[in-house]
Curated annotation (Swiss-Prot):
UniProt-recorded name of the protein: 3-dehydroquinate synthase
Phylogenetic classification of the source organism: Bacteria, Pseudomonadati, Pseudomonadota, Gammaproteobacteria, Pseudomonadales
Catalytic activity annotation: 7-phospho-2-dehydro-3-deoxy-D-arabino-heptonate = 3-dehydroquinate + phosphate
Swiss-Prot/TrEMBL GO biological process terms: amino acid biosynthetic process; aromatic amino acid family biosynthetic process; chorismate biosynthetic process
Pfam families given in the database record: DHQ_synthase, DHQS_C
EC number of this enzyme: 4.2.3.4
Function, as annotated: Catalyzes the conversion of 3-deoxy-D-arabino-heptulosonate 7-phosphate (DAHP) to dehydroquinate (DHQ).
Family, similarity comment: Belongs to the sugar phosphate cyclases superfamily. Dehydroquinate synthase family.
GO terms assigned for molecular function: 3-dehydroquinate synthase activity; metal ion binding; nucleotide binding
Species annotation: Pseudomonas aeruginosa (strain ATCC 15692 / DSM 22644 / CIP 104116 / JCM 14847 / LMG 12228 / 1C / PRS 101 / PAO1)
Class of this enzyme: lyase
Length: 368
């Protein structure tokens, strides 16, 4: 078992990473303040892991809240279901919420914790690779709106993050690949040697070799913890964690939430960010192609939806959270391992990026 720390002063918290942590009270008891616990999960995860988690919560009064599964349910109506149960069961301010599931559950449970009686404790128990390496760490919580992804929410830190790597054994291969988009991101934005490591270990990651998976999660969480510790509320360097996300969120919104998995959209969006960085002269063709090959080896789409036009992208990107004073800012790369957030680029470069034939670009790289 490995322990990392997110350093936020009095709001600091541990990240526990290991196999078969879910049923062990040692990782939960220190972070539960009262007698009552509400476990927020979904119809897919609860049958797999709720019973195991309950073993770690013996001695507490536990209320399970099982929600529909999927990005399409990350909305007000589903959030209200959580509040309905908490109020009906008379949970008070000493209640601890536990998010048992992927990114959707973590985001909604965290937002519910931020709002319920103006703030109660919560613990993240992420069960997908994407949530383990990204969304469970850093305190971003919220829901989607039909006009934009994650536009309604709060920064609200958990008491702890408990990552049981054994939960990945039940993860569909498509979800595993989606999570790898966020793992790869850390190499692209701040850790070029990690790219080399991922190239050498991608087959082992896809095969879920335990030591390799644990190292990938630990390196990813360590990178996220460093960034969050330096910039909790995304006023500066934390925005670099959104590499590929502005393009990716446009894909998710246009296609309908859940049609593309978040990590899939980030994968295609990252290809677009690589291409734009290349067009600006910040990334060589060899670096761009190296990045695309790694994303493709991870099983990710490297071509955005063919039916999406440049105008479609611009319409949705105009609602992005990184837009300031009406100016679109993007996360781009000045070399692999060096991300920047900038709105200082020629509009024609962005337009050319949106109109690039990504199918032809992928085809010219050939098969692995």
């Amino acid at each position: 078992m490995r322990t990392l720390h997110v350093d936020l002063g009095e709001r600091s918290y541990p990240i526990y990473i290991g196999e078969n942590l879910l049923g062990d009270a040692r990782w939960f008891a220190p972070h539960i303040v009262g007698r009552r616990v509400a476990v927020i999960s979904n119809e897919t995860v609860a049958p797999l892991y709720l019973e195991t988690l309950l073993k770690a919560l013996q001695g507490h009064e536990v209320t399970p809240v099982v929600l529909p599964d999927g990005e399409a349910y990350k909305q007000w109506e589903t959030l209200q279901l959580i509040f309905d149960v908490l109020l009906k069961e008379r949970h008070d301010r000493k209640t601890t919420l536990i998010a048992l599931g992927g990114g959707v559950i973590g985001d909604m449970a965290g937002f519910a914790a931020a709002c319920y009686q103006r703030g109660v404790n919560f613990i993240q128990v992420p069960t997908t690779l994407l949530s383990q390496v990204d969304s469970s760490v850093g305190g971003k919580t919220g829901i989607n709106h039909p006009l934009g992804k994650n536009m309604i929410g709060a920064f609200y830190q958990p008491q702890a993050v408990v990552i049981d790597t054994a939960s990945l054994k039940t993860l569909p291969s498509r979800e595993l690949s989606a999570g790898l988009a966020e793992v790869i991101k850390y190499g692209f934005i701040c850790d070029e040697p990690f790219i080399t490591w991922l190239e050498a270990h991608m087959d082992a990651l896809l095969a879920l070799e335990p030591t390799v998976v644990t190292e990938a999660i630990e390196r990813s969480c360590a990178a996220k913890a460093r960034v969050v510790g330096a910039d909790e509320r995304e006023s500066g360097v934390r925005a670099t964690l959104n590499l590929g996300h502005t393009f990716g969120h446009a894909i998710e919104t246009q296609q309908g939430y859940g049609v593309w998995l978040h990590g899939e959209a980030v994968g295609a969006g990252t290809v677009m960010a690589l291409e734009m960085s290349h067009r600006l002269g910040w990334l060589s063709a060899a670096e761009r192609d190296r990045g695309i090959r790694l994303l493709r080896r991870a099983g990710l789409p490297v071509v955005p939806p063919a039916e999406m036009t440049a105008e479609d992208f611009m319409e949705h990107m105009a609602v992005d959270k990184k837009v300031l004073d009406g100016r679109l800012r993007l996360v781009l790369l000045q070399g692999l391992g060096n991300a920047v957030v900038t709105g200082d680029f020629p509009r024609e470069i962005l337009d050319a990026t949106l109109r690039t034939d990504y199918r032809a670009l992928a085809d010219q790289l050939g098969d692995e």
